[in-house]
Amino acid sequence: QGNYQALKECEKAGIQIVPATGRGVGGIPPMIRELPGANYAITTNGAVVADLKNNKAIKTCGLSNEMIQRILNIAKKYHSATDPFIDGRAITEPASIDHMDEFGLSPEMQKLIRDTREVVPSVMEYVKTTGAEAEKVNIFMADLEEREVLRKELMAIPELSISSSMYNNLEVNAKGADKGSALLWLA
């Protein structure tokens, strides 16, 4: 509540509020999106700069469809759950969402994932069929040693940037998709 009041004070002072998150734009709480001073957001680790008032992306730095398929093929060698973020929403499949306990996710995180994922029969088939680009690919790992092996394998691809917001995940973005670069572009 104190943070929200501070944001309201920024708004009164004419300061632009720019939420920056690893989530898609839909993951920004409505109470923040609806602040009059929040006109733009930086989402999916900087892959998207979104115009919140007109509900559209104004800058993107995404992963090509071919690169998404490459990432998914690499990740499937490990006990992982992959969620590409496509058009502002996370895509998952039953094999991932039905086995979240295996990835050490708390009940609260499991609820958040269920509430924010679109379940399709097969992530790979969805990616191939749509031909879509992705803002990022989130990968949950069951084995932390495998996570480090996978991180190194993905870091060897120069077009990628790898980060993590949890002890058991990897977030794969296109090189150049980061919150700092997105904020500088917006400025």
Range-by-range predicted roles:
Residues 2, 64, 177-181:
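Charged helix-capping and loop-helix junction motifs
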Residues 2-3, 150:
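Residues at alpha-helix caps and immediate loop-helix transition turns in enzyme cores, especially N-
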Residues 74, 78, 85-187:
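Conserved acidic, metal-coordinating active-site core of Asp-based
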Residues 3-105:
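Active-site phosphate-binding/coordination module
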